[in-house]
Amino acid sequence: MTKAKTAPRTAPLVEPEEELILPETWRRRPWIPITILVAVLAAVLGAGFAMDKALQPVVPSQLAGCKTSTQVGPHEFVGLQPICIKPDKSYTATLYTTQGNITIKLHPEYAPVTVNNFVVLAVNGYFNGLTFWDAPDWEIQGGDPLGNGRGGPGYTLPEEKTNGLLWNPGSVGMARIPGGPVNGSQFFITKLPWPGPGPTAVYNYFGEVTGGLLDHVAAITPGDRINTVTITVS
């Protein structure tokens, strides 16, 4: 049996590339395309700057003087944040996340050092862009610059006990490893009541979610991000 021969392939004709022809006006005035390019670049950079400013936390005048302790590295400081909050004021934090906004009423009457620490970090942009690295059934956890549960601001917080308070859905506290100190920046928000009989260690209860926004908390999954945090004072 003779195999049929395949007809030899013919290379496709390739049309020569058309010469780029500039408009007559541009040929006479070569600076015009350069001017247009500069204008486009300026618009792009301007949009990026505007976006960056939009992600910056809005700082109320009462907190304009809230500065961090000496910074020794990215997301790292020498120690606790200087006291900035006032005992006669009320503070609310709004977390603008990839799943919607979460409003938290802060409780300095229960944990003044913790609330002050959170406020100072927030108004100085510490939490901007950080992810919620953990989100099991009953809570979500964020505030870790490393995004793996091992990070922090370079210092820890003292225990601030709140005897008798119930950890209901929407409660906000500070994370800690078993047997270790209270983390300086990692916080959690409960989606359900604390499992079992309640916590066996101090987790510095310092706030609660308000405004019926627990659906946004429940929607958070690992990898969701805090875009920015704003603090309001009343």
Residue ranges and their predicted role:
Residues M1-S234:
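Cyclophilin-like peptidyl-prolyl cis-trans isomerases
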